[in-house]
Amino acid sequence: MDPETLDDLVNELFDKKKQLTVSQKQQREKLQAYMMAQLEGSSSASDDDDEDDGEGEDDNDSNSDEDESGSESDATSADDSFSSDDNDDDDSGDEDGSDSGGSDSDLSFEDDSDYEDSHSTEDLTEYTINSENSSVEPTPPKRLKAGDKRPCSTQEEEESEDDNNNKPTARKLQMGESATNGRIQQRKSMVEPATTSKPASCPLTRKSLPANGSAAKSCPLPPKNQKQSAAAKSCPLPPKEKKLSSGAVAKSCPLPPKNEKPSSSGASCPLPSKTSKQVQPRVCQLSDKPKSSSSQSTQKRSKNEAAEGATDTNGRQEAHRQNSIEEGRRILSWVLNPIKPDDFFKDFWEKNACQVQRNAPTYFSELISFEMIDQMMLKHHLEFTTNIDVTSYKDGRRETLNPEGRAMPPTVWGFYGEGCSIRILNPSTYLPGLRTMCSLMQEFFHCLVGANVYLTPPNSQGFAPHFDDIEAFVLQVEGRKRWRLYMPLQPSDVLARESSGNYTPDQLGEPIFDEVLKPGDVLYFPRGTVHQAITEKKHHSLHITLSVYQQQAYANLLEKLMPMVLQSAIKHSVSLRRGLPLHTWQHLGIAHGATKCSSRSQLIKGIQEMVQQHLTPSENQIDAAVDQLAKRYQHEALPPTILPEEKLRTVFGSRSATDAHGKCLCDYELTEDTSIRLLRANILRLVVDETHLRVYYYVDNALEYCKYEANFMEIEPTEAAAVETLMHAYPAYVKISMLPLRKPERRIEVATALWERGLLMTETPFK
């Protein structure tokens, strides 16, 4: 058979009208070469063999039939396989176009170890989209056709005044597919950094399904450090009558005037600061490492100085000698700078609102940012309602729009792009810098310092006017937000113990404060102050609200105290146990309130005298009630952030090993000459619970609020004096031999037990 006949035979195996792909053409060429080899073999065999021609023809016919059928099956399978490959290529192209660089079931992170630390293998199995344990089939992401409209996909839409369109400027896309593909363009606007000096911080590699099962639009990140035209007045609120000078404290009613001006150098930052052209200090790093002239010298001396406890260039004591209460005060000073804490508590605390204005846009930028929120949602399992709220306030109506399930960036940013506010309820759980700040401040305030983060798109409001039951410190991180404060509507709302419901605009009077917060500014207002906030037309807002002194009033103390007093009085006073007079019902009660008679007057006077006589608390009862409030603090507090110098002196830096026989070898040993002190001033509390003497402590608390029961250890009454000695000596070190216990062995045992629980620190490292 000549090549032309063979070619005709090959063409018969394929549809002539079908347009062949490159892979099919290659397959046809392979088949053609195979048939040529078969023909050459059969022709040579016919020349050499002397067998019957008829048999040869029959054999050739059968072989030809077999080859033909085999070729058809090969061609069919090849066609299926290559068409499948083509489909896979198309799918992968769509994934790339819709911001995916991997398979649907894969997530990549910049640091896998960080993710492994926060998730167990079971967590990964549970939350993987394609998990075998999942009983719900994931809904495939909605694909838009080429002609469908996507946000910010055309030049005409980009130039239109969309208040919620905050795609960062100066981010140029490369020419090619990414320049025309709307899905790639949207993802690049989310992933690429705002400046070219830093690498991309978002490790997104695929488009995740929205938590509520519907396709949520992705929203580009808002611009950072966006410049505003001086002539533009985009705020939808009524114009202000006055301007506040930069660096001054607001003097709007009812704030008392302050003549104090910030110094030219500004207050020193409580955290080591980098060189900056700004006059005011900025947050750079939430740690207490000493400053160094170069990074090389810092690396060489870091371990030695951590062990020796070197003093930093600011003249502060080394970390292991610092008083945690004073450190918390120092952080508050930095937040309120240039107002001093003493002046703040004298003039503003629980009295008036206070605004601090700064020309320092990066003052709080190290605490949180848009990119940090994006990474936080990727690296940790945050749930709607539990960790994140989606809220809106439009036309006087407040709504919470939380879907169910995990909060992933595409879903959250989709809500944000639609004008919703995002509230993060416990960011300090996931952000070490913010957690360190709160853990230091809680030592000063002697109560939990909570933090919420609020992210609001331009020209939006997420919450209705209301008041809270906390002292609020608003730290403006990014963008601008206009705040209006109102006097409490009722006298009982002053220093309110519970938060209010939502107010309508017609219930409010004229605001006593109406100002715009800019990055670096701070606003304080007492609990019970009615407030509302709205972003300007062309500015988003990112701020932190620090909440302190929740349920920390005299009323809370009396709620603990008076039941104790009453129970003790009943136990020790027989007069309180006597029965009521028989005629009590006929003279007392609401129906007899207007009655004037001697019997009624005598009954009322006797009860009042009985209360004055028997229900006056003793010192011991007041102490016990305060201990109960302190016990609540031990349960609610954030765990302490252990600094390098402290780690070398605590159980957190201890490493155990085994010898050749498997015996455990510890690298520490406390003796009578070992000097010890408490890790923090309020790290523990000695409390009497009924008949038990317990030491409550918060060093082992979870990062989530009250996730576990309160931690405590029971001690003998004879050992309480040793704990009291450590509490009174703080922040000084005392030798174990100074503990008021009879036997040296017992002193060492008590000290070792406290040290092994992370409550004590030694003056000298064991290593």
Curated annotation (Swiss-Prot):
Q: Phosphoserine occurs at which residues?
A: 44, 214
List the record's Gene Ontology CC terms alphabetically.
nucleolus; nucleus
What InterPro entries does its record include? JmjC_dom, NO66-like, RIOX1/NO66-like_C_WH
Q: Which residues form the JmjC domain?
A: 420-565
Q: Where is the composition biased (Polar residues)?
A: 127-137, 177-199, 262-279
Q: Where is the composition biased (Acidic residues)?
A: 46-71, 82-98
Query: Predominant location of this chain?
Result: nucleus
The question of whether Nucleus is a record keyword is answered with yes
Q: Where does Fe cation bind?
A: 466, 468, 531
Where are the membrane-spanning stretches? Answer: none
Q: Residue ranges of region Disordered?
A: 21-324
> What are the names of the required cofactors?
Fe(2+)
Described purpose of this protein according to its UniProt entry: Oxygenase that can act as both a histone lysine demethylase and a ribosomal histidine hydroxylase. Specifically demethylates 'Lys-4' (H3K4me) and 'Lys-36' (H3K36me) of histone H3, thereby playing a central role in histone code.
Q: What is this protein called?
A: Bifunctional lysine-specific demethylase and histidyl-hydroxylase NO66
